[in-house]
Structure formats: C-alpha cells, structure tokens
Amino acid sequence: MANERWILAPGQRVTFARFMELALYHPQLGYYARPRGAYPAGPEGDFVTAPTAHPLFAALWAEILAALRERRGQPLTFVDLGAGDGRFLRNLAGFLDAQTVARLMAVEVSPAGREAMAASLPQVELAASLAELSPSEGPCVIFASELYDALPCHLLEGTEGGLCELYVEASEDGTLRLVADNPSTSELSAYL
C-alpha cells in the first residue's frame, strides 16, 4: 500500500484487525475511500471478481432468484452486502422482471460506491451499514460475494506457550512488521 506510513507512527502497534480496518476504510486514505476507477482492473491495477467480471454471473443469479420466487410464491428482497459501485446490481436489474424482486437493497461503506450507485441505480435502497436498512417482510436473499475478504480480522497463532496474536508494528524507519504478543482481548482465547 503506497500510504502505509501514515497508518502507524514509528514504534506504534495495533492489532491486525485495526490495521486492516484503517487500510480499507480510513475516510481519506483507505482502499475503499479512493475514487472509483483509480486502479483499473488488470495486472498493474485492481483485482477482478466474479460479480464484476461478466454480466453472465448476474444472469445466473436472476435465474436463481426467479426459481426462489416461484417456490416461495411471493416477490423477494435482495440485499447486496459490500456492493461496491453497484456493477453487479446494475447487471442483475437488467435480467430481473418486476415480479421476482420487490426490493433491491445495497450496503456499501464507501461513500464513492454509494454515490456511484445512487447515480445509476435509483431503484436500489442504499445504506452504509445493515442497521440503516429498513426491515423487509417476506423472503430475503443476502448476497455477500464481495464482503468477506474485506472484513477486518485478528491474526492468531498457536504456539507451544499458548495462543498469540500478531500485531502490526511500525519500525523507526516506518516499515511495518508483524509482532507476536498476548491476545488483545480475552474474548479471542475464549472463542477458540
């Protein structure tokens, strides 16, 4: 990451979860705060994922949703968690009929992503968090293809001495390294 030195002052240490949160979601410098298209897809740029690679993926999901609607006997609500700029939802909306999905909803933490969706998908209810969405009645499909790889997480390591957590620490010259130490919270040990 080009701006990694801003995240930690020399000698500062944070959990990997906190570092990941800052690197992805910092309002000015985080990965998801950058303007859309700043890193075009390809070897020198951003990665390509199934929802954005080809409209065929959305066509497949439209067929799945139509079958679910038929089976349930009522229109569905479709929620895309981590919707990005809405490319998948734009493709999906083009394949859906009005009888299949009653509501299209998107959760996206990036203001730039929500802005892009607001401009091109007026029929989609947008929110920065799941808690901001109004409740849905009837069957609901939660789609989270782009979400799980962007959830901050703790890095843990089992050693002969017990459970350790890996922290990100900045050296005096600003380079980052992983340092093992006691878990940041007892909840981590209790969970495992």
PLM region spans:
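Class I S-adenosyl-L-methionine
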Residues: 6, 134-192
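Rossmann-like AdoMet
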Residues: 1-81, 85-139
